[in-house]
């Protein structure tokens, strides 16, 4: 036994000596080239072929990586793979906030087997730690992630032709089946995180739909038809040479349902929402970076664009270089103005209708404002904001929808006299759907009480509005009378000097005549 350990010690000493000699004699570059050569030789004589699918491709996220990750994380695929693989496969389980399902995934540097058309395919989740860099122009993730696909060489055509397309299609199907959309917001100052993501996301679970949306049915129908034609119009946009995008401008008083309409659009189309906060974007370059990182089939929203940044009527707050700085009255929430932050109007226009707006496809831009008269006309023209949707005060059809949503009351369930009162008052009351909803929520347990209070509120608003209109008319009449009196005084003031001049001139003429008579 002692001879065995003596032999092992001698062998280890010999290996250590040889390693030291190799490191001293051969430079690192030569050793690395030799290892690469050995790897290539091994691949030549190997019966398998390998494909690497990295998470990040240059500056962009690899969509194929996301598709593979979603495909492998589906519970059905994982169960099938585990049953056909060895029992040592390690899976990671995650559940993100607001999600209704548990997500499966491969652990770091673990493998899983998939079967496609009778062909066995091996997937490996490769995670490599990056070396710490003392300086870098762009932050890099601490880990380099990717999937390695291993198949037999004779099955190469199968993978390239159909398997990857199958994975992409399956991932889209899984996502539609899960019905989980994402709501994104831009990071402060577009500071890219470790994985080059300028957007932070949460699960989007807004219940608003076009069925529950309180607005005119005809207007709602036109919007749904326009959205449907857009989603199915890939061939049309390609044939006409137009970018596959659409712009909507929602304008109207606060509380009229602009945000609810955006949520209903996302639920109707199954699109993600990117809520762009312009006050967090410092310049046009960062605006382009944000657009580059948005996905297809998404709605890009800028709410209250007239308040977010001073991009209203041209000529106001304009610098010499043509840019529009933040309004000094607008702060970052802490009471401090962002120094040196500016986005030009041309940058925003190019964001919606320039070359950069073609990044990706099937995108919808939605701007909202409470004061459309403040916006620059260049921002509202067709091609940028294709459809202008006025979100006005609550009308009788919208009121009936709210009664159905909150109280489960149909038109035939209500007294015709009460309905007539509502129909007569709601137009003149100028009440928002949000105010009506608040009354119904307070009394949702008692439908009769809710209806009585709605009628009472509508009548009170009508009386107040009539009084307000009457006061305005009286004020206008008073102003008109004052203006007339002032004009009359001005005329008198102008006439009095002329009259004096005439009197003086007449008196002088009489004196001259008397002097002539005396002579």
Curated annotation (Swiss-Prot):
Disulfide bonds: none
Enzyme class of the recorded protein, top EC level: hydrolase
Entry's Gene Ontology molecular function annotations: ATP binding; ATP hydrolysis activity
Pfam families: AAA (PF00004), AAA_assoc (PF14363)
Signal peptide: 1-24
Cofactor requirement: Mg(2+)
SMART domains found in the cross-reference section: AAA (SM00382)
Reaction equation(s) it catalyzes: ATP + H2O = ADP + phosphate + H(+)
GO biological process, one term: response to stress
Feature: compositional bias, Acidic residues: 479-488, 509-519
Nucleus among keywords: no
InterPro entries: AAA+_ATPase (IPR003593), AAA_N_dom (IPR025753), ATPase_AAA_core (IPR003959), Mitochondrial_chaperone_BCS1 (IPR050747), P-loop_NTPase (IPR027417)
Keywords: ATP-binding, Hydrolase, Magnesium, Nucleotide-binding, Signal
Chain positions recorded as ATP binding sites: 252-259
Biased composition (Basic and acidic residues): 489-508
Region (Disordered): 315-335, 467-519
E.C. no: 3.6.1.-
Family: Belongs to the AAA ATPase family. BCS1 subfamily.
Protein name per UniProt: AAA-ATPase At4g30250
Organism this protein belongs to: Arabidopsis thaliana
């Amino acid at each position: 036994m002692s001879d065995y350990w003596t032999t092992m010690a001698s062998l280890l000493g010999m290996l250590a000596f040889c390693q030291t000699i190799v490191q001293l004699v051969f430079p690192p570059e030569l050793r690395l080239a030799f290892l690469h050569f050995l790897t290539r030789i091994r691949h030549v004589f190997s019966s398998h072929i390998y494909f690497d699918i990295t998470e990040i491709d240059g500056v962009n996220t690899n969509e194929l990586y996301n598709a593979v990750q979603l495909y492998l994380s589906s519970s059905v695929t994982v169960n099938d793979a585990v049953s056909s693989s060895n029992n040592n496969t390690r899976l990671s389980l995650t559940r993100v906030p607001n999600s209704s399902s548990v997500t499966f995934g491969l652990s770091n540097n673990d493998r899983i087997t998939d079967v496609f058309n009778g062909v066995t395919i091996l997937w490996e989740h490769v995670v490599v730690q990056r070396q710490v860099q003392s300086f870098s122009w762009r932050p890099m993730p601490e880990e380099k992630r990717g999937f390695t696909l291993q198949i037999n060489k004779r099955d190469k055509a199968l993978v390239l032709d159909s398997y990857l397309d199958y994975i992409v299609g399956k991932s889209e199907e899984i996502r539609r089946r899960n019905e989980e959309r994402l709501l994104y917001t831009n990071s402060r100052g577009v500071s890219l995180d470790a994985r080059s993501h300028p957007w932070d996301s949460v699960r989007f679970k807004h219940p608003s739909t076009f069925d529950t949306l309180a607005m005119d049915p005809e207007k709602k129908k036109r919007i749904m038809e326009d959205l449907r034609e857009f989603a199915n119009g890939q061939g049309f946009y390609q044939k006409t040479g137009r970018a596959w995008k659409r712009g909507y401008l929602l304008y109207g008083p606060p509380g009229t349902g602009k945000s609810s309409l955006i949520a209903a659009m996302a639920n109707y189309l199954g699109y993600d929402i990117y809520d762009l906060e312009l006050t967090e974007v410092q310049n046009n370059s960062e605006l382009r970076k944000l657009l580059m990182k948005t996905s297809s089939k998404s709605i890009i929203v800028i709410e209250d664009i007239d308040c977010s940044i001073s991009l209203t009527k041209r000529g106001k707050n304009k610098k010499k270089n043509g840019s529009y700085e933040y309004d000094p009255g607008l702060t970052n929430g802490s009471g401090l103005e962002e120094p040196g932050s500016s986005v030009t109007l041309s940058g925003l226009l190019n964001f919606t209708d320039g070359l950069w707006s073609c990044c990706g496809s099937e995108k919808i831009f939605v701007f909202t404002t409470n004061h459309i008269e403040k916006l620059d006309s260049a921002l509202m023209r067709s091609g940028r904001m294709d459809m202008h949707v006025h979100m006005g005060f609550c009308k009788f059809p919208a009121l009936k929808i709210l009664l159905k949503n909150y109280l489960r009351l149909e038109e035939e369930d209500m007294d015709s006299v009460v309905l007539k009162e509502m129909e007569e008052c709601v137009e003149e009351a100028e009440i928002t759907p949000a105010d009506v909803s608040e009354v119904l929520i307070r009394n949702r347990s008692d439908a009769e009480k809710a209806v009585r209070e709605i009628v009472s509120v509508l009548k009170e608003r009508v009386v107040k509005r009539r009084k307000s209109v009457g006061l305005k008319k009286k004020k206008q009449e008073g102003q008109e009378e004052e203006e007339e009196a002032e004009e009359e005084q001005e005329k008198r003031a102008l006439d009095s000097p002329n009259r004096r001049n005439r009197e003086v001139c007449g008196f002088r003429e009489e004196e001259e005549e008397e002097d002539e008579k005396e002579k």
